[in-house]
Amino acid sequence: MNCEDQAVDLCKAIDLCNVSDNTISHPTPAEEILPRDGLQLMDGDQEEQDAAVLTRLKDVHLKDDALHTKNNGSIAVSADPVNGSAGDLQQSTVEEPLATKCSVGDVGDDGEMDIGVDLSLDENGVLEFEPTAQTQSEESASSCENSLISDTVIELHSQEPLEEHSVDVPSETVPAAATPVVEEAGIKHGLKRVTFPSDEDIVSGAVEPKDPWRHAQNVTVEEILNAYRQACQKLNCKPIPKVLKQTQDLKDLTQRNECLDLKGEKLDYKSCESLEEIFKRVQFKLVDLEQTNLDEDGASALFDMIEYYESATHLNISNNKHIGTRGWQAAAHMMRKTNSLQYLDARNTPLLDHSAPFVARALRISSSLTVLHLENSGISGRPLMLLATALKMNMNLRELYLAENKLNGLQDSAQLGNLLKFNYNIQILDLRNNHILDSGLAYVCEGLKEQRKGLVTLVLWNNQLTHNGMGYLAAALPFTQSLETLNLGHNAVGNEGVHKLKDGLISNRSILRLGLASTKLSCEGAVAIAEFIAESPRLLRLDMRENEIKTGGLMALSLAFKVNTSLLRLDLDREPKKETVKSFIETQRALLADIQNGCKRNFILAREKEETEQKMRLSASMAEIATEDQTHEEEEEEEASPLKKIEEETTDALKDATQESSEVSENQEPKDQESTPQDDSDSDTEDEETPTNTSLTSTSPIPIPAAADTSKTIPSTPPIASPAVISGITVTEASIVTPSSPGRCISVSSPGRGHKIFMVTRVESPPEQQQTSIAMLKSIQPSAITDIKAPSQTQNSTQPTEKSHAEKTPDAQQEDSVSTSTPSLDANIDQTQLTESVSEEEQKKAETLNNEADINEDANTGAPLPNGLKPEFALFEFEGAKPASCIMEHVSVTAELSCGQDLEELLLDASLETSRDAP
């Protein structure tokens, strides 16, 4: 067979093997002769495809026919790189031109072909191929990048045209293989690329959690009962009669019901599972599971339900000794996850070493739990250490009960002391019936010193304390500002311990309740406690039962009640103690009765004080100024009786004007300062309260401040047919504290806004001129209510007028200026003319007649002055020779100041003299 036939058969064989047209095609004449430059390596996918093509061309007897084809001649197709080996080609980053050639019958000296693949004809004339060396063919295939499919030129030693017998890769494969060598080398060295979708495409979907209370909407009691019965039937357990009855009694299913009481019921796992039909539809305030014989499975199921459905705010799991580790783990998960649980009672439920870490981890996270009962839970040692460490960071727990846990005085007490140093949120710490001892009390007191605003109640009942430990407690009490209840009952404190404790109790100002029951006290200790009672202004309750307190101690306690007004309850033994003298027994009974009466008295005082505080709070919320009708009704009710007495006192005082002083003030009913508060006012001196007994018209002292009063004011009322009251203004004559002083104090209360009260101080005229004024007063009609006093014509008349002007408030000055209208000014002019023409006595008579006419004219007109004052007030103060009313005093002061006097100095002197003369 010649070379031409073999080449034709090779092309047919490739076509029969379903080689695609993209792999083998006829090249152009130029491509047959010249090698193609710039040929790129194929990618990995193309290599696999080409390897599959070669595999389909293999025969089963490759190795046996290889030698035969070498002897008979073969067509060798080689694709050797020009510049180097296959290894050099892989490492090179620069593309090298490839030269491919096809030689027929070129065999080396050793009889082997220098290509990777041999194509030969077997005995039957079937074209076969076999790699000369399998390893060489694999290396050639990988290094040359499938050179058989790349640009291949077949050289034939024949005279036939080259274009009819050439095999080449078509030009369409060149762009596909034109990938940079750098990227191909990077992929081959294992550099992979990972891409992620955009943020919007990452989450393909979401599922909302199921609503735990989806079954509780529009549900009825019958539906709940039916669901519970069906659950019991499905679980093959009997319905609990107590559950059926309590469910039947449910009223409002939209709110939390009071209680689900399962106390004493034996709950196994199936019974607990059936309760889910109740919990998923109804919520409760308290779920009582006390002594229900819960095991690990049942407890876990119930706690998971309560956590998921938030079934309870208060949970009682006490007296369940078989909850186990899984039960406590579920309970801890419930405490950590639920937001509704506030109270957990786990007394008499063991919390052992392997369960304590779960509870500690739950308490470290600030959950909603505020009250935790762990009495008799066996938490001494490591469990207490874990709990105390966790509670240092807890911010919500308020009450911690650790009674009857056999806490010792070393390690456990040290943990409690450290807890008190760091946690300022615990308000109640109950350590009763433990073994704290005096050594442990020292640790607790170290932490107690840091509790300046946290701990309120500390119970150390029955902790084997003695008088030695009271020293630590007495040293800590002055530092505690929040401790209100201290219970030291059933400890051997003794008289010596009470003496040590007394100083600390007196220094402490926060203790309200003190428990000293059964502390081995006698009369000596009772005397020390009595000293504390007398010094304490806040103590409310004291328990001294089961102590040998006899006559001497009871006498000291009884005397202490004469000073103390705060102690409301003192617990003592009802029966008197045995005495050697029989009469002392009756004395003890009498003293006990006195102590009881003292408690009752303090209780009444406390109740009155509380009512007073309530009234003060109410008055603070009311309007500052009441309506005139309301105040008028209050005036008629409260002041009916004092008015008559005021009139009588005023009549007597007018007859003896030389030694009596007048006081113009509002009339108000005296009040008990301890039981009735004073109303608020707008006075600038609300805080100045100096009660003085200056009025003789009332049964109890009326509080009158030195400068301005804050007491209740009464608006003006219609004139009463009395010589003492005109237009709501009351004139009260009272004796002054210093009778030697000729001054007179007039207190005027304005019924307008602000309840202003001002003082007017005057100096009396000499006695001879006052007698003349009294004679003139008798000639005036009784209806004219005036106090006529002739002032001296010397400096004594000018100085009090200046004082009165200095003492007046702006409201009073405004009233005076308004009152200086035509009646008063006309009177002044007429009086001036009379002094020039008539004698002194005729002048006095004329002034008296003119003033009387002015009073009648003002009474007829009744034109009120500002703040409700009527013009009668303008005629209230005038004396003998010239009118001396407040208005005329204002005019005279102005005239005197124009003569060169300094106004500021006069006001200062007037205020100083007023402060001395005023009561």
Curated annotation (Swiss-Prot):
Coiled coil: 833-861
Record field: compositional bias (Low complexity): 691-701
The keyword Zinc appears for this protein: no
Keywords recorded for this protein, A-Z: Coiled coil, Leucine-rich repeat, Protein phosphatase inhibitor, Repeat
LRR repeat segments: 340-361, 368-388, 396-417, 425-445, 454-474, 482-502
InterPro entries: Leu-rich_rpt, LRR_dom_sf, PP1-Reg/Actin-Interact_Protein
Stretches with biased composition (Acidic residues): 631-640, 677-690
SUPFAM superfamilies: RNI-like
Molecular-function annotations in GO: protein phosphatase inhibitor activity
Region (Disordered) location: 626-716, 790-866
Similarity remark: Belongs to the PPP1R37 family.
PANTHER family tied to this protein: LEUCINE-RICH REPEAT, ISOFORM F-RELATED, PROTEIN PHOSPHATASE 1 REGULATORY SUBUNIT 37
Name under which the protein is recorded: Protein phosphatase 1 regulatory subunit 37
Organism of this sequence: Danio rerio (Zebrafish)
Gene: ppp1r37
